[in-house]
UniProtKB/Swiss-Prot annotation:
Pathway: Carbohydrate metabolism; D-tagatose 6-phosphate degradation; D-glyceraldehyde 3-phosphate and glycerone phosphate from D-tagatose 6-phosphate: step 1/2
UniProt keyword Lipid metabolism, yes or no: no
Uppermost EC category: transferase
Reaction(s) this enzyme catalyzes, per UniProt: D-tagatofuranose 6-phosphate + ATP = D-tagatofuranose 1,6-bisphosphate + ADP + H(+)
GO annotation, cellular component aspect: cytosol
HAMAP family per the UniProt record, alphabetical: LacC (MF_01557)
InterPro entries named among the record's database cross-references: Carboh/pur_kinase_PfkB_CS, LacC, PfkB_dom, Ribokinase-like, Tagatose/fructose_Pkinase
UniProt keyword terms in alphabetical order: ATP-binding, Kinase, Lactose metabolism, Nucleotide-binding, Transferase
SUPFAM superfamilies the UniProt entry points to: Ribokinase-like (SSF53613)
Name used for this protein in its record: Tagatose-6-phosphate kinase
Length: 309
């Protein structure tokens, strides 16, 4: 079983408009609302793929109830209730652009943070892999993921971390390391304080930096150019075919789902990397975020090329 952690989920609201007019009224006909947050995207893709998945995080108010009530029944919902209201994130789709308005989210108390930590320990009992995705809510310290990873490691669980900024930096500088991190080039550049490109030799060099010591897998997303990965002392380039992209939103989360599934099933390096990339591509072919059409899985799987470099 795989446990997904989404500490700062949201209701994602989509407003499609032919044209966004400023300083006047814009009327929307086709409004969609879905449970949002990177970890919930991971949950839905794992569910589509047929994995047993348990979802947790912090939710509150009517928005939190909406998230719990609108997840597929086959996803085990184990969310921790807080006093604040779960946030709403608005995406305005207009003229080929996407303008986002993101709420910060609720402020958690010390007691609520302690309560979630206790629940997290309990939820580890029957899982093999834990994914941790997205931003931390207000009130949680930057090193909170580090705390969860330490608990998971002590219980012999594999962990996949997908976050950025101070939260990721705190984990890299901490004592407890995740099994996998999945930065993109922009996040890697931010961490290292220098611009990183798709140059394989440069990537090889930086991924051996002491900052990443103790992390078994480092999987760097190159967007439409695939992935550059380091597993222990071996480096891989994953070459993916060109596809028609409907929406790339959530494709990174779908890749995380593939990584988690690969770890849970003890797959070899090539199988794990191939599965992860296929799920990311399948999500990009769908209008709905965090959804994959498994009818296209086998064909894409055969088109992925994993090369040791």
């Amino acid at each position: 079983m795989i446990l997904t952690v989404t500490l700062n989920p949201a209701i994602d609201v989509s407003y499609p408009l032919d044209e966004l007019k400023c300083d006047t009224v814009n009327r929307v006909v086709d409004v969609t609302k879905t449970p949002g947050g990177k970890g919930l995207n991971v949950s839905r893709v794992l569910n589509d793929f047929g994995e047993t998945v348990k979802a947790t995080g912090c939710v509150g108010g009517e928005s939190g109830d909406f998230i719990i009530n609108h997840l597929p029944d086959s996803i085990l919902s184990r969310f921790y209730k807080i006093s604040g209201d779960t946030r709403t994130c608005i995406a305005i789709l207009h003229e080929g652009n996407q303008t986002e308005i993101l709420e910060k989210g609720p402020l958690l108390s010390v007691d609520e943070i302690d309560g979630f930590t206790h629940q997290f320990k309990y939820l580890l009992n029957d899982v093999d892999v834990v994914t941790m995705s997205g931003s931390l809510p207000a009130g949680m310290p930057d090193d909170y993921y580090q705390k969860l990873i330490k608990i998971a490691n002590l219980n012999g669980k594999k962990t996949v971390l997908d976050c950025s900024g101070n939260a990721l930096e705190a984990v890299l500088k901490g004592d407890s390391k995740p099994t996998v991190i999945k930065p993109n080039l922009e996040e890697l550049s931010q961490l290292l304080g220098k611009e990183m490109t798709k140059d394989f030799e440069a990537l090889k060099e930086v991924l051996q930096d002491e900052l990443f010591e103790g992390i078994e897998w480092i999987i760097v997303s190159l967007g439409a150019d695939g992935v550059f990965a380091k597993h222990k002392d071996t480096f891989y380039n994953v070459d993916i075919p060109k596809i028609k992209i409907v929406s790339a939103v959530g494709s990174g989360d779908s890749t995380v789902a593939g990584i988690a599934s690969g770890l849970a099933n003890d797959e070899d390096d090539r199988a794990l990397l191939t599965k992860a990339n296929v799920l990311g591509m399948l999500n990009a072919q769908e209008k709905t975020t965090g959804h994959v059409n498994m009818a296209n899985y086998d064909k894409l799987y055969q088109s992925i090329k994993v090369k040791e470099v």
